[in-house]
Amino acid sequence: MANLVRAKISALGTYVPPRLLTNADLEKMVETSDQWIMERTGIRQRHIVDKGMATSDLAIEAARDALKQRGLTAGEIEAIFVGTVTPDMSFPATACIVQDKIGAKGAWGYDISAACSGFVYALQTAAKFVESGAHKRVMAIGADVMSSIINYQDRATCVIFGDGAGAVLLEPATDDNYLIDFTHEVDGSGACSLYMPGGGSRNPASHETVEKKMHYVHQDGQAVFKYAVRKMAEASETVLSRNGFKGSDVNLFVPHQANRRIIMSAADRLGLKEDRIIINIDEFGNTTAGTIPLALESARQQGRLKKGDLVLIAAVGAGFTVGACLLRWAC
């Protein structure tokens, strides 16, 4: 019987655009204040792209960063999966653009639309291709340019979102530091709690959809908050209990950076103290599929992430989509 192949994260790369949008900037744009934003979200600034920059541009930089860390060329990558809700265009897939621009000549791939859970979904997709033996080097990317679909006259959403990307390389593990388990869930009854109604086949782009501001994010904040707190905790408990762990065993909890109150409420349900949680939403805002790799990088830079650590990742996104992953850090 062949040995079971497990997948590990062998490299992590990230990128955010240099331009900052601070709470002070937003005070000049909408009726809000730094205190109001900080109390409700925990965000003090977010990075946003300059005009003409797209999701693939961020994803490319993150991918190159990961390759550089691993000492590999793009030609050695066999597949690329991109989690995003802000693709460069409806088609082709942003993964195709990334594949071409980084020079991954032999790679294939596709986009995954799971909103804030997009990186976790891309991570499992990539892991399964490694574990099946189909590929040895696969890249999972989470990237979004949320500023492209935000109405900067809507206080409820413009204070939350930012732009950013992260990429991880997955390879077969040679020790016990690998992706242990995943859990996923969708609940389509929450589709209208967080969505962009315009631009698809239901409401194709027209003068009317533009005038009605249908190409911007619409959110029921209270519904999202309640669902996210409950499901982020439930998904986390599932992967922990299924593998014989408790919250107290976790070295680092890496939640989707949606809102500081959501993060702390979910962590409280898991019995996790703040010194076991990485929170960088104050610096980057909610970058949708980019939040988890950016949070992993923040933890690494702070010296809070080392090889062998038990890491718990969890996210809830539009859809609703839910995802969690338990892993031993390997790089």
Residue ranges and their predicted role:
Residues 1-51, 154-226, 230, 234, ...:
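Condensing-enzyme catalytic core mediating Claisen C-C bond formation in acyl metabolism
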